[in-house]
Amino acid sequence: TGKMRKLFKNMLPYWHIIVVIFLLLGVQAYCDLSLPQYTSDIIDVGIQNKGIKYILPEKMPEEEYRLAELFMTEDEKDTFEAVYEKKDDTYVCTADKETLETLDDELLTPIVLTYRMANMSETDFKNTIAEALEQNPQNQITKESLDEMSIEEIGQMMQMELATYEAENDDGEMVTYVDMRPMMQQLIASGAMTQDGIAQSREYMENMIDSVGSSTLHAMGTAYAASCDEKAGLDVEHIQKNYLWSEGGKMAAMSLLMLAVAVVVGYLASRVGAGVGRDLREKIFGKVVGFSNTEMDKFSTASLITRSTNDIQQIQFVTAIMLRMLLYAPIIGIGGIYKVLKTGAHMEWIIVMAVLVISGLVMVLMSITLPKFKIMQKLVDALNLVSREILTGLSVIRAFGREKKEEERFDEANRNLTRTQLFTNRVMTFMMPGMMFIMYGVTILIVWVSAHRIDAGQLQVGAMTAFITYTMQIVMAFLMLTMMSIMLPRAGVAADRINEVITTNSSIIEKAEKETIEKHTGKVEFHHVNFRYPGADEDVLEDIDFTAEPGK
């Protein structure tokens, strides 16, 4: 923590730029987290629901308006009628978006019941009629005989005209559907069906709907809205295209904004990193030029060169990366978790498992490589030392024929550094393939679990897509923090080495009050002077009085 404080202390003069970076990263994270939701909406609303978001039709014919109230309670009818206004022979919805979102929950049951009764397959219709006939003790028609009858024959038997139409089913086959609502209206008008009967039908359908799932329910509601809009003369295909273009345009705008913010953040982070590097170089240079031979011997010239170049470069690089990753990772991670909870996918355990597996992988790799990272800078110092000694004493080496020996010294220092770098790099090469394997494994697991939930009607395809993206964002945020945990210790060591130079004072200290020599005589005098070698416990010279006269 002490090393980290030294690292962060270097950034304090640039706090105002860091605040701007933090705010811009918030904007970038907002855009990044919005894109999966737009993708989900395009799939679920734009493609599956034909661009229709709400279950109440934008426009509906008068006949359909009356049929829609068939399964509504009195309170629901009042609510329904309050948001529609009659224009010619159609009814137009006047509710705003907030009201429509509220009514999606309040009127979902009667709207879905209306949709199912208006689009009942031939098999479901016969089953419903058979159950109704079984409750009549005077009935002599069996279910088997009913199955053999056509819909027209059933209508003749019931003395009613049944409304039928043909449409493609989910398998692309043309099948016959029955609209049972006119029949129910006739039964109500004739007194054959009472409100209690309608309530029983509603309860029966509600039990059936509960087993379908809320996701499928809403899709059925929007399908009803689309059919009503089409009957009222609206171009549903045009509505769908407009929705897709609108959502796609928003996605493009978000992407461009995110790109612009990322460029600005990268520029500002680089400026801060370069500024920190400049300040540290200035401080080190100011200190080193005032060092005596004692301090130069303590650090060695090679080490000072490494600290002034490689160590500062390390801090400069980590500072820029840290302002991009260390600040961004928590924002995107927390935002991703919030968005995941909003999807209602109930697969948070997959994210927890992925994070734990990645943590285990990173901890294993870190435990192997971190000790090597710590000695890396010392090995760079050793290589610089040997290189400088060879270059400085090149003429002496040639004079005494020690070229072979010096080559061996350099090769040894070079091999030590190379072996360490190769070891760390080889170990760390397992990280990215391991991460990719985990991420793709998590994606497959999400798709597998989601497939069962989609089949049960508890999840939509778009929500699954959004959940996968949010999961990847959370995992990547954790991965960013992990990568920083690798970089920060090395930068912390570099900061400690630089701070060691900056905090070292020269052993030659001038008096605060300097004496001005008016007359230069060239005479040197020692009065009660003591001397000891650096690090020694005792003085080797004590209480020395000495006078050196000019020319003597």
Over which residues does each language-model region extend?
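ABC transporter TMD-NBD coupling linker
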Residues: I42, N49, T392, E408, ...
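An intracellular "coupling" helix at the cytosolic face of ABC transporter transmembrane type-1 domains
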Residues: P13, G172, M180-M184, A192-G197, ...
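Helix-loop-helix
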Residues: G335, K339-L356, G360, M366, ...
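Short intracellular "coupling" helices and adjacent cytoplasmic loop segments at the cytosolic face
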Residues: I47-Y54, P61-R66, T73, L133, ...
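ABC-type nucleotide-binding domain
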Residues: I18, Y54-P57, A68-D75, F80-E85, ...
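Juxtamembrane helix-loop junctions of ABC transporter transmembrane domains
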Residues: C31-Q48, M254-D297, T301, I305, ...
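A short amphipathic helical element positioned immediately N-terminal to and/or at the very start
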Residues: T1-W15, L304, S308
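Alpha-helical segments in transporter systems
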Residues: R5, H16-D41, S211, Y243-M251, ...
